[in-house]
Structure formats: C-alpha cells, structure tokens
Amino acid sequence: MLTGQVRAPYVPLGNPRIDRRHAHSVALAAFFRDAKENGGQDWKTAGDFFLRAPGSRDAPCERVGGFLTPVPSEVTGALLAILPAPALARLGIADGTWKAELCALLDQVRAELTHDVAVFEERRREAFEARRSDLAARFERSINTLTRRPLLGFLANRNILPKYGFPVDTVELRTAHCDSQVGSRLELSRDLSVAIHEYAPGSELVAGGVLWRSAGIYRLPGRELITRSYTVCRGCQHYREGSQDLEPACTACGRPADGPVREYCVPEFGFVADPRTGKPGSVPPQRSWNGAVHVVSLGTELAETRWQAPTGALAWCHSGTRGRLVSLAEGPGGSGFLICDWCGWGGPNHGRAPRSHVNPLRGKPCTGPLRWRSLAHTYETDILRLRLDAPGLDTRAQWHTVLYALLEGAAEGLEISRGDIGGVVHAGADGSSGLVLFDTVPGGAGSVLRIASTLDQAVAAALRRVGACDCGLETSCYGCLRTPGNERHHEDLSRSAALTVLESLSGLRLAARA
C-alpha cells in the first residue's frame, strides 16, 4: 500500500443478500414516503413502527404488505434499474414474489419485539405489586431501551436493510433484563457463525466494564428452532445430516457408522445473558471455540478449470455459487450444550443435568425438558472444490498443511482479506479427499471464484511464504501456516509437507476450462 501497489476495491454484484436488502430498502423508502405525504405519519423508533398503538388494530409494519399489493410501478421500476439482471430473476422482481420475504422478516421482528416488551411489562408489574419500585423502574427503563432504538439502525441490525460491509446473519445477546444498568444501553450483536461460540451458553465476555455470562438461547413463542441430526464418519471425516434417521453406513467410504449421531439447533433469534452480572478480573473470560465447518453440499453448475505443472502435477478446480456449509459449535470438549426446549436455558456439559433451572429472561423456575445439542449456523456461499494429483498427499495432516498454505498464499498473492476465505479437507461422495475453499461471507463475495481462475498466483505466493519462514521444516508457526482458527491442527502442520506439494505445483498453467 505504501508503494502504491494495491488491488482496487472489489465488490461483487451477484451477492443475493446484498441484492435482497437493497430491494427491501427501495420498498420501505417508498412506503415511508407514501405514509408521510398522504397520511402525515412518520416513525423514528422501533417501537413506533413495530408495536401496535393503543386502540389500533395493526402496527405500521403490518401495513407494508398491503402497500406492496400490487407492487407500485415506481418500486418495480427502481428495482429493474439498480439490480443486476441475474438478481432480478432470482428474487422474483418481475412477478412481485420478492415481497413475501420482506413481509415475513418484518413479521418476525415484530413478534420478537412484542414478546420482549410483554416480558418486561409483566416483570415490571410484578415488581410494582411487590413494592419494589427500584426494580420496577429498571424494567421500565429496559422497555424504553427496546422501543426507542432508532428505526433505521434497528432494521439494519435485524438483516432487513443493507449496512456498511458485507451482509451477515447477526444475532444479539440480550442484556436489558440484567441487574446492571449498563445492560439497557448495550447492543451486543455478532455474526451468527461467531456468536455460536462467543455467546454460547456458559461463555463470558466483557462489555461496558461489566462481565456478562450467556445463560441460554432466546426462544420466541410460536416459533421453533431449526434442528437436524448429523454425524461425521470417523474413517474419512465425511459429514452427513438429515431431519430423520441417517443411513447406517457412511455414504462416502461405506464404513459402518461408528461415530455419534448428534443434533444441532440454529439459534437464529439470539441469546440471553444471565441476569446476574460480575466484575472483570485478572482471569480471562471463559469461552469455547470447539467446533468445525463442514460442507453440506457443493452446489450446482460448478465450472471446471484444470491446471497442469511442468512436473506433471495436476489440479482440478470446480467452482460455483450456492454451496451450503454448516459451522458447528460443540461446546467444551466437544460434548455439546444442555438446552431447555421451553425457555432456552442452556449450559455446557459438566457431567450431569441439573435438577432444576430458571428461565433466564423471566426469572421464574422452568420445568421444560433438557436436550444435548450443538449450535449451528448454516449458510450458502461461493465454493471451490480443489482436487490435486501431486506427491506428498497421503495423510489428512498433509492435506491440512496444503489447505492452510493455499489460504495464506491466496490472501497474500491476490490481496484478499484472510478472514474472508476459509477451507476444509473434504471427503467427497466417492470417498476421495480434496480441499474445499469457500467465502466466509454468506451469499459469497467472489473471492474463491478468483482463486479458481488465478490458482497459479495463489500457489506461487504460498510457496514464497512457506519457503521464506525461519521456523523448523518439520514444524510451523504463525508466520507461515498457523492461525488462531486452525489451532486444533497446529501439531499436524509442517513446512516440509507444504513445500513438497507446493514445489510440485510450481509453474501451474491453465490446461482446460469448462
């Protein structure tokens, strides 16, 4: 950057989440303008827009569907002008079907806010009847915090409107009900793939000078969390999931299923903090990053690119969009979390289930059933499957070494943020091992598609990085292969294994494209 050699900013136009949220912004802008000009109505806060006023049959957000039926011509015209052609067909702009998801999102957010306000109002009333005026005042302030949030920022944080940066599936750790007054002023939001670790039941974090502890996941009345069974083959590490019983044998290698069949849930409504807060101390907050990313499906219509090196080594790239991934958080020791089906209370596995627990949001005893579950974030993104015919790829440790060498090389050589790309060693349906690289951005940012078309540059940069490091050949360090995210594989990563493969791939040339 200092010498003036830096890649120009790159923004893909085909990210469906960016496209959809811009469509939402056009529709809501037209709705707000119509309400102001024809009805003199103006909503500044979340409560104004999402809650029903006394004596009113509906909330303003519930009128959006009627305004968009049929979709006004000026809205359709604006969408046709600003969205790329592939997005028009994918979202259903021409026939107006795109509006259904907007209305569904608005209804979900309305239900969440209505439920939260009702819970705090109930607790405020109980405190008042118990002559706890201080506690009643705190719950009143919590209600004000929820209802007086600026509307546009609230819509962006709820994944309805676009915001700066690539879209993510954000969830919140709710703190307004806690005993610290700081909780009513905080908005602790994270990308769901990060939140399943940082906000998982039992995890701790420091914010606003207060130590918070997650007490469970947020349950919305009338809405059930998505759950699925899954297992990982102990032989080839092939991942399988389903809503019903899984096949008794691995579909990739045929090995009889000997790994545990677990269940995950997607905490899409967020998390709830323990009402009792603490003070930060000298001991770091407790947190567990035990888990992994798995490939559920590679998507469809993969474009193939074949590369060949002077040594005879070959590389096949199959790249495309809409690959489906699942990021799992399996708790300390990989034993999962105990979660209540009714109130969402949760905790890590400490050997036995507690005899009783308290609803973390309402503060009342709950007798709901408890289940052992993992936490998950599922999403679609751009994906690249890479098959290699090169020496030195006989073990999974060697595959992991090459994986992280290529990711670091692609980040340096193609000027891609390392946090925007990830990868796994993947056992395909035929049992063969390979690498899967993916964009960490839901919907895809086009990064791995660039890697597929410039694999030679990524390999060259990886070779320079690994070859120039000063650590021992039989080991690795944070200057070549190691990152905090691949800590579980640190002992398997070695520079010599990476150099063996990368040197055989040096000088790659494009052989065929399909």
Go through each PLM region and give its residues.
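Short peripheral tails and domain-boundary helices/loops at the edges of structured domains
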Residues: 220-248
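Extended, highly charged accessory segments
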Residues: 9-12, 16-209, 215-218, 246-514
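Conserved segment of the helicase C-terminal RecA-like domain
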Residues: 1-9
